[in-house]
Swiss-Prot record:
Keywords: Amino-acid transport, Cell inner membrane, Cell membrane, Membrane, Symport, Transmembrane, Transmembrane helix, Transport. Belongs to the dicarboxylate/amino acid:cation symporter (DAACS) (TC 2.A.23) family. This is Serine/threonine transporter SstT. The gene is sstT. One of its GO terms (cellular component) is plasma membrane. It is found in: Cell inner membrane.
Amino acid sequence: MSEEKSGLVQRLMQGSLVTQIMVGLVAGIALAWLSKSHALAVGLLGELFVNALKAVAPLLVLVLVISSIANHQQGQKTNIRPIVMLYLLSTFFAAVVAVVASHLLPQNLTLQNASSQIVPPSGILEVLHGLLMSMVTNPIEAVMKANYIGILVWAIGLGFAFRHSSEGTRTFLNDASDAVTRLVRIVIRFAPVGIFGLVASILASTGFDALGQYASLLGLLLGCMLLMALVFNPLLVWWQIRRNPYPLVFTCLRESGVTAFFTRSSAANIPVNMALAKKLGLDEDTYTVSIPIGANISMAGASITITVLTLAAVHTLGIQIDVGSAILLSLVASVCACGASGVAGGSLLLIPVACNMFGIPNEIAMQVVAVGFIIGVLQDSAETALNSSADILFTAAACMAEDRRLEQNA
């Protein structure tokens, strides 16, 4: 009997993770439909999974980046610059897509009372100030509070410092990196159970009834995100690899986007993207640095959310904007999106910054934020799926482009 049990456990541990996640997804939907009380109860499984990812992700980023930079050999190529360029281009293009879509399909908002407890940044300078302050925070505090900008700055600095250390120290860092990666792999194997709990509890607690009156706005948001995921991001990938991008696009959406959709945190999805990068055979020196960076600056979904909701408020209030203002909004939305990194629903709190460009008072801007929270069940999930899947997508594209260039020069 014990042999049968061990065989079952082994099959579960070695089976297709994507298939198991889809089974968990379907099971979660079925449970929410059959029994609301039981579905709410299994929400604990989802909370445990998300918290486990969030707990291990800061340590993973710190150790991997330090190890990668410390063990980097002179002459090795990491391809970080083209990857960062792809991240920023995607974030800006997303804002432009949202501006055009909002012009073609203008939205009207039924504004609700906003929560007085929400305190958004007062302007774009405050967003930049916050980013700079995050960079110079205490490293232990950065890890404890999952401040990924601070973690990256300290990890990069320590990585360069450890380049001058002994071979034994660098070997220890490499072993520590392997140990943390093994822990992460164990956590990721519980994704099907975690997603089962998340799906069941989310559907049982909210359903989709509350989204009915906001279907048009939600449809525009999701439509823009689908356009980025299925049209513009693939175009950027094709520009890099010069062949059909869709096999890679669908792999990233399936294996990274699905998990990110339910965790609703790019930071929590870092371990998932790391595992996929290893599976794709990408250069470890590249992806251990580029994926954590992407979790902070690859924010196409957040850029769309900020732009669409701001322009919905603008249209509702009858404010006319010119092309120059629309372009400036795209830039502001892109910068604000980077400031929303790693926070579930963070993009909504930066909407008042964009609204301030058009003289919209904070009281009204906060009502727009409230509308965002009402549709946040799907909006935040889709936003995170786009953001996080793009991290691994552009990392893979840049690595493949570099391999192609090396083959041509060989």
